[in-house]
Amino acid sequence: MKHRTAPMVRHPLAAALCVATILPGVALAQTPRERALEARIAELERQVYLLVSAQQQQQSQIAQTQTQVSEVRSLQAQAPAAPVVPAGKKPIQLSSITPNALPGTTFRFGGFIKADFMTTRTSDGALPEGAVGRYLYIPTQTPVGGQASSTDTDFHAKFSRFNLGVDTVTENGDKLTGFIELDFFGNALASQVNNLYGGTLRHAYMSWNNWLAGQTWSNFIDATILPEAADIVGPTDGALFSRQTQIRYTRGAFSVSAENPEILTTPYQGGNTLLASDHGVMPDLTARYNWKGTWGTFGLSAIARQYRTRSALTNDTDFGGAIAGGGRWIINSSNDLRYQLSYGEGLGRYLGLGNGSDVELDVDGNIHTVTTVAGWVAWRHDYSARLRSTIMYSRVDYDHALANTGALASASQQSLRTNIFYSPLPKVDVGAELMYGRREAENGDSGDISRLQFTTKYSF
């Protein structure tokens, strides 16, 4: 009997190949459970990779932030210290908002919105349409001569103003200041259609430590003592009131300046006519000294001037000057007294808004200075923190030569006014003022002016 195992023995290579072919198929035949486990492992590996990447990115961002913080702290250490702010108050501005400004520069903006409502009566003639005297008290414009009386009503907002200021303290401690202020006193299309008012430059100056250059209040005057009034000046007749371009040096309470040498001239037989000229070579030179204490303030000032004329008849030169004193006396917490007195040869341009002439011309065109005495006094009383009133009297006298000026030149001007102001809110003022003024000419003719004025003002 024959066996069938021989062929398998004879072909071992074929058997091995058969087994090798079958086994991989068995190994690849995974169950669904095994495939699910492998998928979960792959997902876990992906999440671990994402976490590691996020951590590396976060560490990079932290490093960048630390670098930026270090740079900011370095810049802050180099910048000047911020001003100390009182407890409970936040600073309005921490850094400059002016382009290319020096470090430590601050910017300020201010002003007020003022509206005036007034009715004016003149006894001897009318104030012309558009005359400056229709909007504020100009003593030289008070009509005289016996013409019919006139009454006018005017509303305007000409004296609203705004200002810009820049202040800097350098690394060396030098103080730099720039200041500019405008109102709308110009008369461009004053009451036509839209009541457009032209801008008027009040202040435009810069200061460096003790030096000042530009246009501002004359060093000869002290504007801080002027009383509160609905009128933009108040005691206009006898008050020193002038802003002009100058160079000033201040050291403590003492100051000196060289200022614009404009003069006001009454031509021969010109009556009340005032002509402006600037033929002078020498600037107006002033000196001032101020005292202040718990009692109030007081100041003395002096001015030296040169007067020159040019005409077909002659060129003449003369010199003059003036002195002034004034201040504020604090009587008590509810009352104060303000005052000023001035005397000089050629003082007219510095009084009020150019109240009178500095010089007059004779028949040959020669200069003669006009002797002038002026002053005012004002008493203020506070009824409460919100309600107050002021009464004031002002006067100026001129010593003209009738042979030079003629009979219509002003011999004197005076006014009396009283007002009351109420502040319903901080920075808001409403007030009413009654004024009576009188101008007398050299020939004895006179004219009166009365004005009732209401005003509102919001300061910012």
How does the language model describe each region?
Residues 2-28:
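Gram-negative bacterial Sec-dependent N-terminal signal peptides
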Residues 28-128:
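N-terminal periplasmic/intermembrane-space "pro-region" immediately following the signal or transit peptide
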Residues 94-131, 139-265, 281-282, 286-292, ...:
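Outer membrane beta-barrel
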Residues 416-433:
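C-terminal closing repeat unit and adjoining cap/tail of repeat-based domains
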Residues 422-424, 448-460:
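Outer-membrane beta-barrel "beta-signal"
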